Amino acid sequence: VTSITLDLVNPTAGQYSSFVDKIRNNVKDPNLKYGGTDIAVIGPPSKEKFLRINFQSSRGTVSLGLKRDNLYVVAYLAMDNTNVNRAYYFRSEITSAELTALFPEATTANQKALEYTEDYQSIEKNAQITQGDKSRKELGLGIDLLLTSMEAVNKKARVVKNEARFLLIAIQMTAEVARFRYIQNLVTKNFPNKFDSDNKVIQFEVSWRKISTAIYGDAKNGVFNKDYDFGFGKVRQVKDLQMGLLMYLGKPK
């Protein structure tokens, strides 16, 4: 299993961007090009199913498991308040044996299936967000926020609310920034500060399949055959979407 590490002790915007590039480079197939663009495309499913992301702070490491063929979250690993490594996983996404290979630090006895599912709505419900529209948008994004949310699960007794908030922020700061340069640029522009998320961030996040499909099936030389509206105005040039990574949809058309 490949590991990619983000050091959260005084990181720079450049280090963060190179971390995001490593995620893209690990999952992309360099030979795949969709819609006459140079946007990275995830490769077809392979034997290596998972990618391990390590967040390092001065107090220790918390790790995230992502599926390489779509960057969906499958599990996370953290020490509890007695310094025992515990792996928590979404049972529909990964088996116990696969989890052992991904996070060998946690014994089978210390693996626990999460009581909720891996979709944003289910995680948001468990995050108990009370303000605004009660979605992940209300939490904001940014490196400082990633660090504080990680520390809430690092060497602590498990608190579901803190765990769910960590997952919401960690997923966006890894998988979503890899998919969308628009979100990555917000993180680097505000680096390392926490910033308010906007509707466009959420629109991008819920439109990855839709955008990938449009580029794959209805773009030529980087131009769509018609205007597309993904929830933030009409787009004709693919480059205006600032995509970082496309979903695997088969051989180019």
From Swiss-Prot:
Signal peptide: none annotated. The keyword Hydrolase applies. Its EC number is 3.2.2.22. Keywords: Hydrolase, Plant defense, Protein synthesis inhibitor, Toxin. It catalyses: Endohydrolysis of the N-glycosidic bond at one specific adenosine on the 28S rRNA. It is an enzyme of class 3 (hydrolase). GO terms for molecular function: rRNA N-glycosylase activity; toxin activity. The keyword Hydrolase applies. It holds the Pfam family RIP. It comes from the Eukaryota. The active site is at 176. GO terms for biological process: defense response; negative regulation of translation. Belongs to the ribosome-inactivating protein family. Type 1 RIP subfamily. Ribosome-inactivating protein of type 1, inhibits protein synthesis in animal cells. This is Ribosome-inactivating protein saporin-5. The gene is SAP5.
